[in-house]
Amino acid sequence: MGNDVVVPTMRATTVLWDIDGTLLRSGGVAAQAFLDAVAEVTGSRPTPERRDYGGRLDPEIADMLLTAVGAAPARVADVLEALRRLVDERLGELRAQTSAYPGVDALLAKLAGAGVRQTVVTGNLASIARHKLEAGGLIPPIEPGFGGYGDSAPDRAAVARVALGRLSAAGWRPDPGEVWIVGDTPRDLACARAVGVHCALVATGRRTVGELTGLGADIVLPDLSDPRPLLSLWQI
C-alpha cells in the first residue's frame, strides 16, 4: 500500500445563498414593512431596537416583535400576511433601493458557467425573497424555485433541508461535501454544520471579518468583490 493521503474535497457543485447582507442590500424596505405590519395587526408600533435579527426566520422575527409590544404570539400568521401585502404594495420602493453587493453579479455568472446550481436558504418569506432577488437582478442564475424560505420550515436547518430536498426531487443530488452555504451570520454557519455541508461567511452584513473569523467557517471573506480565494477553494 502507498502513503497517499486523501484530502477531503471542498469543490462546490451546489451553492445555497443567504440573501440579506450576503447577496444584496434592500434599503430597509422590508424591515420598515415588518414594523408597519405589527402596528397594523396590533395597534402598537414596535420601537426599532438594535436586536440581532440576522439569520433569523421571518416568523421568529414576527414573534419577537409581537412580544416587544405585548401582543399574543398567536398573531404571527396575521403579521406575516400583512407583511406580504405591504411589501407587495412597496415593490417600486424595493426595486429602487435594492442593489447587489460588489462582485456578486460576476461571481454568480461565473458559477453558473461552471455548472454550479445556485439557490437560496433564507429567513425571508418566499414571496419577499423572490421580490428581493428580482429587484437585485439575480434571477437567473439564482433558481428560487429550489430554495428554502422562512415559511418553508420551523428552523433554519430545516429550511436548508427543504432546499436540498427540492433539488433532489429535480434530480440534482450532490455529495454533501460539494454543497456550500454562503451567509453573513453565525446562524448561517450553524445551519451549514447542522445539515453537514460547508460554509463560507462574508462580512458584508453587520459583522466584521474579525467577528466572523474563528467561528469555524471554511473560509471568511470581507466581501465578494475578489472571489478568487473562494473560486480556488471551490476548484472553479
What are these regions (language model features)?
Residues 1-17, 72, 178, 232, ...:
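Non-catalytic pre-domain segments flanking phosphatase-related domains
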Residues 12-19, 23-106, 113:
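N-terminal helical cap/lid subdomain that shapes the substrate entry/recognition surface
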Residues 22, 104-136, 146-154:
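Substrate-recognition element of Asp-dependent hydrolases with the DxDx(T/V) motif
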Residues 49-54, 77-81, 140-155:
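A short, structured active-site edge motif that brings together acidic residues
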Residues 72, 139-144, 173:
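Conserved H-loop
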Residues 148, 219-225:
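Short acidic-hydrophobic, aromatic-tinged amphipathic segments that line or gate anion-handling sites
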Residues 156-189:
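Conserved Lys-Pro-Asp/Glu-containing loop-to-beta segment of HAD-superfamily phosphomonoesterases
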Residues 181-219:
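Acidic, Mg2+-coordinating phosphoryl-transfer loop and its flanking beta/alpha structural elements
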